[in-house]
């Protein structure tokens, strides 16, 4: 009876953290927000909110979810694993019982998988020439990133997390425009794309923004 609520609560902090990073991306890369607004206007219109029934028809929003998880993983060193037997990797001996951390941050920036400019927030990297969601690289099993982990200890709530991010992003962009704040002189307040605090998750530090009705 407790499994579902605990699973939901367990994923709330990471989803909240991801939404914070995504909103920062909307401030830093307004062209991606404009493209998402255009897709929502064309598919959903202004008479109703987006729903999960729109999921197949919103490839850019779905790509935006993948890119947010790729761009700023909330667990940049993944979940610890332990080797079950002695092993060798590239000349290095790994004894049985060794605690292993995966550098998800670095893996998500592999240019051979993700192309150039992996530091930039670019949902289009997940789209094909026709604008549909492209098939994923086999190494990441269509997830589009390494942020959900590997093997038997990958994220059990990854599908729920994807769905939560999709509907939150779609509804928020349908309803609002996310804009940078200005100081008293009319200049944009600076953005720190690398500002973060460690609270167990990789959480964005404070920043300022405006939400305007879309």
Model-derived regions: residue spans:
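Central I-helix of cytochrome P450 enzymes
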Residues: 1-39, 68, 99-103, 153, ...
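Cytochrome P450 heme-thiolate "Cys pocket" and heme-binding signature region
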Residues: 5, 10, 53, 90, ...
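A structural signal for well-ordered alpha-helical segments within the folded catalytic domains
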Residues: 17, 59-63, 142-146, 162-171
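Cytochrome P450 I-helix active-site segment
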Residues: 25-75, 84, 90, 95-98, ...
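Cytochrome P450 heme-binding "Cys pocket" and the immediately downstream C-terminal segment
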Residues: 30-33, 140, 158-202
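C-terminal domain-closing interface element
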Residues: 61-70, 199-214
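Active-site proximal loops enriched in glycine and acidic residues that flank catalytic Cys/His/Asp
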Residues: 80, 103-104, 125, 149-150, ...
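Conserved cytochrome P450 K-helix/beta-meander segment immediately N-terminal to the heme-binding cysteine loop
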Residues: 102-135
